[in-house]
Regions:
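Bacterial Sec-dependent N-terminal signal peptides
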Residues: 1-25
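Transmembrane beta-barrel domains of Gram-negative outer membranes and organellar outer membranes
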Residues: 24-181
Length: 181
C-alpha cells in the first residue's frame, strides 16, 4: 500500500505540469515573431531550467546488482529521479542573450526579468525591430511561467526511466535505459 501511495504521488508530480504545458507551448510560438536567431535564444533561456533538471535526473538512478548476471540473466527496473530547481532559475535576463531584433522588453516581475517555464506567472512584452531602423515594428507577449512552486508545491522535475540489465558474456552486463521524449 505504501508503494502505491508513493508511486501515485510521484506520477501526479510528473503529470501535473504536463497539463499546463499546452498553454506554455502556444505562448512559446510567439517567440518566432523575433526571427529564428532570437527565437532560439529566447526559447532556450525559457526552457533551460527544465532541460537542465531533466539532464541531471536522467543521469541519476543508475543501479546494478553487485554480481554480474549469468549469460542471458536479466533484471528490469523503473525509477523516478526528482531534481529540485533552485529559485534562481525562475527568471532570465533577455538583455544578456545577445538578441538582434528584440530592442526592449517590459515585465510585470518585481525584478524586471522574464520568467522561465518554472517561474511565476509574470507577463513579459517584447518589442521587435525587424528591419534594423531602430523603430519598433512589432511587439508580442512572451510566455508566462507555469509557477511550479505554486502549482505542484515543489520547484522541481521528475525524470522517469526504465532500465534493463542483461548478462552477455563472462561476467559482463549490458545496461539499456529508456527515457521518455
Amino acid at each position: 500500500v505504501r508503494f502505491a501511495q508513493i508511486f501515485t504521488l510521484l506520477l501526479t508530480m510528473y503529470l501535473a505540469p504536463l497539463s499546463l504545458r499546452a498553454q506554455s507551448e502556444n505562448d512559446m510560438v510567439n517567440f518566432l515573431q523575433a526571427g529564428p536567431s532570437d527565437a532560439s535564444k529566447l526559447m532556450n533561456a525559457y526552457l533551460n531550467p527544465v532541460i537542465e533538471g531533466l539532464s541531471y535526473g536522467f543521469n541519476g538512478g543508475w543501479y546494478t546488482t553487485a554480481k554480474a548476471h549469468k549469460t542471458l540473466g536479466f533484471d528490469i527496473g523503473v525509477s523516478f529521479n526528482a531534481v529540485f530547481i533552485p529559485s534562481s532559475n525562475n527568471y532570465f535576463d533577455p538583455n544578456s542573450l545577445g538578441l538582434e531584433t528584440i530592442t526592449d522588453f517590459t515585465s510585470t516581475a518585481a525584478n524586471g526579468l522574464a520568467p522561465t517555464i518554472v517561474g511565476p506567472e509574470d507577463e513579459t512584452i517584447y518589442y521587435v525591430d525587424l528591419n534594423g531602423d531602430n523603430q519598433t515594428d512589432a511587439n508580442f507577449d512572451g510566455p508566462q511561467g507555469l509557477d511550479f512552486k505554486e502549482q505542484i508545491k515543489i520547484s522541481g522535475v521528475l525524470a522517469p526511466t526504465a532500465q534493463i540489465g542483461i548478462g552477455i558474456y563472462k561476467n559482463t552486463d549490458l545496461k539499456i535505459r529508456w527515457m521518455p521524449e
